A protein has these predicted regions:
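N-terminal leader/linker segments that precede catalytic domains of diphosphate-processing enzymes
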Residues: 1-58, 63-109, 113-118, 126, ...
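Short, charged, solvent-exposed linker or helix-capping segments at domain edges/interfaces
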Residues: 119-124, 141-142
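Flexible glycine-rich active-site/ligand-binding loops centered on an Asp-His dyad
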Residues: 129-131
Length: 206
């Protein structure tokens, strides 16, 4: 692995707008940290008191707000708000193609080098942070697990319209796969793992 190539600007990837209606635009930072042992990826564990995905592992980021000039601005702002990392400690390396989630989110990932972890202070949204050596990801393939996308009638669905099957049961519409990395008791999965997998594929091709 060529660490100098990893920390140089990455090739541009085509960015396209969402093809789904009513998606929530979000942005995340994918932070690389250089230390004596090599390069690490920084992750955060979401607070267990949050209503949305409590305790999940993610990259710093969140919803793109009206005050954000660009998706990148949102990723940097959210990183500062969640981990107290100032913009001057962030050097952007690449913007990856947006990802569409089945939960109605368009996720804009930005790869960056964070020059120091001394400033990291977790806010109420973050339980704690941890790092994983980049080399570990280079040497370990993720697991693949099936997820079912399903629907059932809501409370206001008209009773005079027939619905096949038990209205209280979920009806499977589509099966898709998610990546899972297991590292020292941590389970990195879903969109976060998909972003990691894309980064590793790009780095291996450098």
């Amino acid at each position: 692995m060529n660490e100098q190539a990893v920390l140089a600007p990455w090739p541009e990837h085509e960015r396209t707008s969402s093809v789904l209606f009513n998606n929530v635009p979000c942005a995340v930072l994918v932070p690389f940290i250089k230390n004596a042992g090599g390069l690490d990826l920084l992750f955060e564990v979401r607070s267990k008191t949050l209503r949305w995905q409590p305790g999940d592992i993610s990259f710093p980021g969140g919803k793109i707000e009206a005050r954000d000039v660009t998706p990148l601005a949102a990723a940097i702002r959210e990183t500062g708000e969640e981990l107290n990392i100032p913009p001057e400690k962030i050097r952007v390396l690449a913007s990856l193609a947006p990802l569409e989630t089945v939960t109605g989110v368009t996720l804009n990932p930005f790869v960056a080098e964070v020059s120091s972890v001394e400033d990291i202070r977790c806010t109420a949204e973050v339980d704690h942070t941890f790092t994983v050596p980049l080399q570990w990801f280079m040497e370990h393939e993720p697991e693949l697990a099936e997820m079912d996308l399903a629907t059932r009638p809501g409370a206001t669905f008209p009773v005079d319209i027939p619905y096949a099957g038990n209205p209280m049961e979920w009806r499977r519409r589509k099966t898709y796969f998610v990546y899972i990395y297991r590292y020292e008791g941590y389970r990195i999965w879903g969109m976060t793992a998909q972003i990691v997998k894309e980064c590793i594929d790009i780095i291996k091709a450098m």
